[in-house]
Amino acid sequence: MGERQAVKVAILGTGNIGTDLMYKLLRNPGHMELAMFAGIDPQSEGIARAKKLGIPTSYEGIKAVLDDPEIRIVFDATSAKAHVRHAKMLREAGKIAIDLTPAARGPYVVPPVNLGAHLDKDNVNLITCGGQATIPLVFAVSRVVPVRYAEIVSTVASKSAGPGTRQNIDEFTFTTAHGLEAIGGAEQGKAIIILNPAEPPIIMRNTVYVIPANEEFDQAAIVASVDQMVAEVQQYVPGYRLKDAPVFDRRRTPWGERTIIAMLLEVEGAGDFLPPYSGNLDIMTAAAWRVGELFAQHLLGIRQEVAA
């Protein structure tokens, strides 16, 4: 067997998301080699953990990443405000940015929906945890019948929402709603996030409501499309599951009496670093890993079949 081909990658941001992504890369590096784990807090628990694991670390933030010309892919797990600044510097340095913040300097990507169309970009955005969880389901409906309206409610454990999540609440609602439209295929989207302080903490729960643009659709085809999409997401997020089959219900809406499709979704984390109830964070790091792996394969010239 030949030597494993790998692209050098870096993680920028040493909080919960950055640290969980670090463990995912160590558990399953694929075609990636973690060459730098950088933040700005010398007392960061994440940096301490990385040092013990023998990973190169720095608390000089993006400077440390820019100083290594061999790093090709950078996962930015900082904040929306920070990424606006980082995006320009990474682009000028010729590095690919995978943005885990709601900054959205590059196109939105959801791995099983549209990643293949953006493998030539130098910056892609993973939207939000709610977007990664729910956009696949809206897209699964919209590829069968046009969607007039999609609304999602993401409920996450308060304990799983760190300062970055709390600071980005407004960006979450706007970015997720736009993702429901731009990628999910809905004419109009709306997103709501709820932080639930219950003890013991609950796993991530999402309610997805979809109103088709017309009544001329095959319910069985929609159910089959949704089931296929769930199976695709489960390839990189094993804890992603529907609570039950989609429910079709006639209700009054602003567009008259219509069929509303309701789907209840849970996301349980893999427990790489964060507790299993943090499915909202896990789906972001799992999606980031998947996007990074496919970018690495693309850079290495490895053929792949990816949704476009």
UniProtKB/Swiss-Prot annotation:
UniProt xrefs under InterPro entries: Acetaldehyde_dehydrogenase (IPR003361), Acetylaldehyde_DH_C (IPR015426), NAD(P)-bd_dom_sf (IPR036291), Semialdehyde_DH_NAD-bd (IPR000534)
Active site, UniProt feature: C129
CDD domains noted in UniProt: ALDH_C (cd23933)
EC category name: oxidoreductase
SMART domains attached to this UniProt entry: Semialdhyde_dh (SM00859)
Signal peptide positions (record): none
Keyword NAD among record annotations: yes
GO molecular function, one term: acetaldehyde dehydrogenase (acetylating) activity
Binding site for NAD(+): T14, G15, N16, I17, S160, A161, G162, P163, G164, T165, R166, Q167, N168, N280
Keyword terms: Aromatic hydrocarbons catabolism, NAD, Oxidoreductase
Any one GO biological process: catabolic process
A Pfam family assignment: Semialdhyde_dh
Catalytic activity: acetaldehyde + NAD(+) + CoA = acetyl-CoA + NADH + H(+)
Disulfide bonds: none
SUPFAM superfamilies per UniProt: Glyceraldehyde-3-phosphate dehydrogenase-like, C-terminal domain, NAD(P)-binding Rossmann-fold domains
Top-level division of the source organism's lineage: Bacteria
UniProt-listed Enzyme Commission number(s): 1.2.1.10
Family membership noted in the UniProt record: Belongs to the acetaldehyde dehydrogenase family.
Name this polypeptide is given: Acetaldehyde dehydrogenase
Species the sequence originates in: Thermomicrobium roseum (strain ATCC 27502 / DSM 5159 / P-2)
